[in-house]
Amino acid sequence: MENNTAVLGAGFSWGFKSDNVMKCQEQEEQQARENEKSLNSMVANLVQAQGMDPKGRKRRLDEPTNPQPQMMVPPRKYNVSKRRPHHSTISGQPLPLHRGLELMSKDQLQYILIEVMKNYPISQQLVQNKLVDFNFSIEKCEILLKEKLQQLHESIPYSRSHDYQRLSDYAFVRMKPHILEFLNCLVDCVLDRIPPRVDNLHESLKILDMTTDMVTKLPRFQLASNNYYYDKCLEQLACLWCTVIEHIARDVIMTVNDAPLLRNWIQKLELYNELCHGILTKPLNQFKSLAVVDAGVTDSNSTKGTNATRNRWSGSTDNYTVGDNQ
């Protein structure tokens, strides 16, 4: 037992370190402290030699290089919390169909309608059926024709002579599209205001008077062939006059009661016939025959005379046909 104790040592047996071990640890700790102190002193000397202070450098980086005067902010009585801005999600959109149609101009609506009929030909019949139900007044037709006539006059090229009855070939080339547009529109309007489209023959006479007056006052050209479209339109108007006069001849009441008015129409037709160089001769003769019949209506045999007149004029315009629009 004694030998074992001497070999192992009392400190080891009971968990205590010997004095030699304690002294060695103290020496090591002291040596480490000295080494750390010497290292810190070396770093301090090195930094001082370079003129740099770690703490001061840190402060200089935090502070602005150019100090600016700070604005005094008045203290707030109440702290207001900042809210995130609310952005609206509503975006623009085009007008509804019915609202857009209300705001469209006549030209815009006409353009869209024509485009629809071009792309969908089946819609043309639908539009045509709707147009049949409409009754356009003579005043509207007159406004439309005056617009076309204004465009025709604006297309006349400048001329020093200002002679609109002897225009040149160059003027005809410039004016031809407007001439055709005006004449076609004129014939279309007249055809819409004669029987059986309308029952009032006075309206038919009124629009015939208006359109004939317009055609006779159109600017003409020095070369006779350039006036072909005018003469062709006057021939169509002559056929239309004859058609309306036939309906008047069948209307006994109008022939008797409106005799003075019919005579007034005869005087106008005579003037138009002179201006167009006799193209309206046939309808003028028909109208004059009605005036002769009207003079014999006062007799007791007025009924027979009227029937004879109606038989005489039925089919009197068989040789007249409304030509195609050029």
Curated annotation (Swiss-Prot):
Cytoplasm found in the keyword field: yes
InterPro entries the record matches: Cut8/Sts1_fam, Cut8/Sts1_sf
Record localization: Cytoplasm; Nucleus
Cellular component GO terms held in the UniProt record: cytoplasm; nuclear membrane
Region (Disordered): 51-75, 300-326
Record-linked Gene3D superfamilies: Tethering factor for nuclear proteasome Cut8/Sts1 (1.20.58.1590)
Family in the record: Belongs to the cut8/STS1 family.
The protein's role, per its UniProt record: Involved in ubiquitin-mediated protein degradation. Regulatory factor in the ubiquitin/proteasome pathway that controls the turnover of proteasome substrates. Targets proteasomes to the nucleus and facilitates the degradation of nuclear proteins.
Assembly, per entry: Binds the proteasome.
UniProt-recorded name of the protein: Tethering factor for nuclear proteasome STS1
